[in-house]
């Protein structure tokens, strides 16, 4: 909304910016993942991200002027900052939380639920602020970064030796070859194919606020209503994060992935078929069903079928990084489609792509019954290196 209504960019230009953000995130995510796997439970990388979050206010206050001056330079700078801070940084935080949940013995979804509640509160307030002064949101972002840094400094973690015993080998013993060995595993590429389809939801979400706001008599009313809708969605998502672990444990990680992908396809295709703000809102709210199941299932699937020491690398490369690649390629095409054909036909094409990858994934993803035995996750020889299976 801010890029379109306040900076004055067209959908194609907005797609260029999102493409740059995704490209930078693509480069940062594998690096972040491997670094965090090496760090284990140490918070060094999270502290760096916290400092970048604090700088979000000053950055965005000058970002609009840079974009109006030169869209290409602005896209590069925006890609560097947003890609490294938010798009790549959120994956580090989520994988860190999931790693702690495995060690401490609680469900990841119950911790992630609080992130959804925070997002819901932020979007509710931002929906009001953007009609008053969008800069208020940027100041709030920096304040939130300060709070995150304080909480991170107060967070107590396990001793490294306890972590090493639980993870069947020291994270510091990981090498680049351990991470690269993933590329030789057919099951890794099957996971990549699934993610290629499901990450289309991020491209769908990028300019959905513009589409939704256009359904109302005035853009101001549309902005405010979108803030309410987004807040409701994320509050429902938080509830879904609490319930999703029970469902995924019942149906299995693979079936959970396929269910989330099916809901996603229905949501995107439905957005292209229905008319009016009420029905479009219903399609948007399906995200609250889809995302909790997807996140819980992807972490459970990774822990069942891959070396657990590489959990951050798997999530940031196998999920976040692939999402960035697809977003880099599809964001400009989606922007072109919105400008020349409209939102509805473009959504139909996106939804059909998700249907195709879902059907292929139903065949290629490994069943829970083929999960690796605990002792096969790593080779506990003197070198303590993970072996491809």
Located regions from the model:
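Symmetry-related core transmembrane helices of the 12-TM Major Facilitator Superfamily/SLC fold
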Residues: 137-154, 345-364
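Helix-to-loop junctions at the C-terminal end of transmembrane segments
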Residues: 27-41, 130, 240-253, 338-339
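Pair of pore-lining "gating" transmembrane helices in MFS-fold secondary transporters
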Residues: 1-6, 80-81, 183-204, 285-289, ...
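Intracellular juxtamembrane helix-capping segments at the cytosolic ends
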Residues: 86-102, 293-307
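Juxtamembrane intracellular "pre-TM" segments in multi-pass secondary transporters
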Residues: 156-192, 217-218, 381-388
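Short amphipathic helix-loop junctions that connect adjacent transmembrane helices
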Residues: 1-13, 206-226
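A late C-terminal transmembrane helix in Major Facilitator Superfamily
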Residues: 309-340
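C-terminal ends and interior cores of transmembrane alpha-helices
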Residues: 51-69, 263-275
């Amino acid at each position: 909304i801010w890029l379109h209504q306040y900076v004055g960019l067209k959908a194609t230009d907005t797609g260029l910016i999102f493409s740059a953000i995704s490209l930078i995130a693509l480069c940062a995510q594998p690096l972040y993942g491997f670094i965090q796997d090496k760090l284990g439970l140490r918070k060094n990388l999270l502290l760096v991200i916290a400092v970048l979050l604090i700088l979000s206010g000053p950055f965005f206050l000058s970002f609009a002027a840079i974009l109006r001056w030169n869209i290409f330079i602005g896209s590069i700078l925006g890609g560097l900052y947003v890609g490294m801070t938010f798009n790549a940084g959120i994956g580090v935080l989520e994988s860190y939380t999931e790693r702690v949940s495995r060690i401490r013995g609680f469900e990841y979804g119950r911790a992630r639920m609080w992130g959804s509640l925070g997002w819901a509160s932020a979007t509710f307030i931002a929906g009001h602020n953007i009609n008053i002064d969008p800069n208020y949101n940027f100041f709030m972002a920096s304040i939130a970064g300060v709070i995150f840094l304080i909480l991170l400094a107060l967070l107590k973690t396990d001793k490294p030796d306890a972590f090493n015993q639980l993870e069947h080998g020291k994270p510091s013993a990981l090498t680049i070859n351990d991470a690269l060995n993933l590329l030789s595993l057919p099951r890794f590429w099957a996971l990549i194919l699934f993610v290629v389809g499901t990450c289309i939801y991020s491209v769908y979400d990028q300019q959905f606020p513009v589409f939704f706001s256009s359904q109302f008599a005035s853009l101001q009313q549309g902005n405010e209503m979108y803030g309410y809708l987004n807040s409701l969605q994320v509050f429902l998502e938080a509830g879904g994060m609490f319930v999703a672990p029970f469902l995924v444990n019942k149906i299995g990680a693979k079936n959970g992935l396929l269910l989330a992908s099916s809901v996603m396809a229905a949501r995107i295709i439905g957005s292209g078929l229905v008319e009016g703000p009420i029905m479009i809102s219903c399609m948007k709210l399906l995200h609250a069903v889809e995302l909790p199941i997807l996140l819980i299932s992807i972490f459970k699937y990774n822990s069942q079928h891959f070396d657990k020491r590489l959990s951050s690398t798997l999530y940031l490369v196998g999920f976040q990084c692939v999402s960035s690649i697809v977003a880099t390629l599809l964001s400009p095409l989606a922007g072109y489609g919105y400008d020349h054909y409209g939102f509805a036909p473009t959504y139909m094409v996106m939804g059909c792509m998700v249907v195709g990858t879902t059907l292929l994934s139903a065949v290629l993803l490994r069943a829970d019954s083929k999960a690796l035995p605990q002792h096969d996750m790593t080779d506990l020889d003197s070198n303590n290196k993970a072996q491809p299976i």
